[in-house]
């Protein structure tokens, strides 16, 4: 729902699937002046077989972690990706997000997102957990088992819900950059140690992809021809007035050359 408007601005058509009728109504009201949006209410596993379109992009933002409930079966997360894969157009991509089960903040005293308890993911989920997060190796394994052989990992920081910076394997954070670690607005937490100093050591040891708080993954059945310039880093400076709020991207071409690009976040900044 939250992404529908921005996707509609960039795509010819957008299809939304929501289980909550209230969420569907809110989404429809919010986007009533936009064209090309279809909103379905109901269980994904019941709606997906009846979708006749093929999609260039499929977004599972927060949905993948809920796969056990969405696709009750022996291998629910793989089956969810397999179902989404069947809806892809040739060359299409699936974008999914997940909190990292081994994210540094969970060691440092943050509650687990879905159980509300401490260290649940680190110690291993029980069978009763309907939602769960994943480590990077777990994500890689289930994505490949679903038949999506090519994947690119990105690392939203502090997390994918309220990211201020997005890193990639081609542009990882540097020592001293990860200092904004107290953005847990929804639950109380402990402060077990200085996360900034811990991140500095993790970065120095080359382990940031293991302990990043969140993942954003772009997956394909097979690698298509790469874009001439691919964004490998984005930083949002939108805590300013709308006139001065910008996004800074670092793009990389096939030869490894890097280019900086600045984009206004709001129409006022484009004037």
Spans of model-derived segments:
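A short acidic, Gly/Pro-enriched loop at the edge of an enzyme's catalytic core
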Residues: 48-58
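Conserved class I S-adenosyl-L-methionine
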Residues: 95-118
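A short SAM/SAH-binding and catalytic strip from SAM-dependent methyltransferases
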Residues: 56-75
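Short alpha-helix
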Residues: 128-155
């Amino acid at each position: 729902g939250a992404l529908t408007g921005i996707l509609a601005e960039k795509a010819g058509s957008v299809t939304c699937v929501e289980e909550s009728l209230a969420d569907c109504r809110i989404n429809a009201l919010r986007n009533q002046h936009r064209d090309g949006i279809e909103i379905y209410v109901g269980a994904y596993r019941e709606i997906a077989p009846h979708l006749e379109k093929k999609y260039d992009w499929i977004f599972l933002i927060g949905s993948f972690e809920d796969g056990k409930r969405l696709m009750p079966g022996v291998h629910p997360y793989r089956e969810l990706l397999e179902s989404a894969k069947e809806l892809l157009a040739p060359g299409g991509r699936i974008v999914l997000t997940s909190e990292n089960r081994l994210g540094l903040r969970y060691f440092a005293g943050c509650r687990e997102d879905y159980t509300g308890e401490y260290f649940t993911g680190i110690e291993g989920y029980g069978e009763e957990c309907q939602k769960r997060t994943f480590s990077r190796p777990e994500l890689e394994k289930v994505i490949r088992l679903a038949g999506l052989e090519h994947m690119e990992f990105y690392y939203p920081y502090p997390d994918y819900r309220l990211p201020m910076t997005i890193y990639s394997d081609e542009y990882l954070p540097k020592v001293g950059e990860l200092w904004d670690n107290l953005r847990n607005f929804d639950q109380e937490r402990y402060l077990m140690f200085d996360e900034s100093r811990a991140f500095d050591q993790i970065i120095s040891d080359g382990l940031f992809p293991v302990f990043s708080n969140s993942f954003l993954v772009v997956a394909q059945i097979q690698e298509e021809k790469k874009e001439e310039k691919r964004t490998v880093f984005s930083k949002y400076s939108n805590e300013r007035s709308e006139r001065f709020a910008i996004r800074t991207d670092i793009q990389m071409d096939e030869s490894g050359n890097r280019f900086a690009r600045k984009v206004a976040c709001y129409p006022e900044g484009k004037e």
